């Protein structure tokens, strides 16, 4: 459960990301593909090379979904319902992959914003990404 402080930390951090969200989403995806190669199996039709237009486009989708989640942080299930349906029923993404991507998002954000990435912000973002992952996998059951 996200506390008021967690929500504040997430909103403040995401506000500083601003126009870089798509770039960070792309970088996190690339990190995920490199660190967890099995995640590539969900993208057989993609050019997965560094700087690929397809990876950039999907990185932007990830960033847009997270921006939507931040904007509706008090109602994640409704905000992410359509995305949850897509991943559970159509794409059938293994839930562990959300954990992998979450980890790579944390690494990416820490690399780009080391001064702001305090232990409290790290914990808040980790809880937020976990909450998003929980919602995205909630329809698997």
Swiss-Prot record:
Quaternary organization: Heterotetramer of two alpha chains and two beta chains.
Protein name: Hemoglobin subunit alpha
Residue numbers bearing the N6-succinyllysine modification: 7, 11, 16, 40
GO cellular component, one term: blood microparticle
Protein family: Belongs to the globin family.
Function: Involved in oxygen transport from the lung to the various peripheral tissues.
Chain positions found as Phosphothreonine: 108, 134, 137
Coiled-coil positions: none
Tissue spec: Red blood cells.
Residues with Phosphotyrosine modification: 24
Superkingdom as given in the UniProt entry: Eukaryota
Sequence ranges assigned to domain Globin in this UniProt record: 1-141
Binding site for O2: 58
Modified residues (N6-acetyllysine): 16
Taxonomic lineage: Eukaryota, Metazoa, Chordata, Craniata, Vertebrata
Example GO BP: hydrogen peroxide catabolic process
Keyword Acetylation appears in the UniProt entry: yes
Phosphoserine, modified sites: 3, 35, 49, 102, 124, 138
GO molecular function, one term: peroxidase activity
UniProt KW keywords: Acetylation, Heme, Iron, Metal-binding, Oxygen transport, Phosphoprotein, Transport
Disulfide bonds: none
Organism field: Lynx lynx (Eurasian lynx)
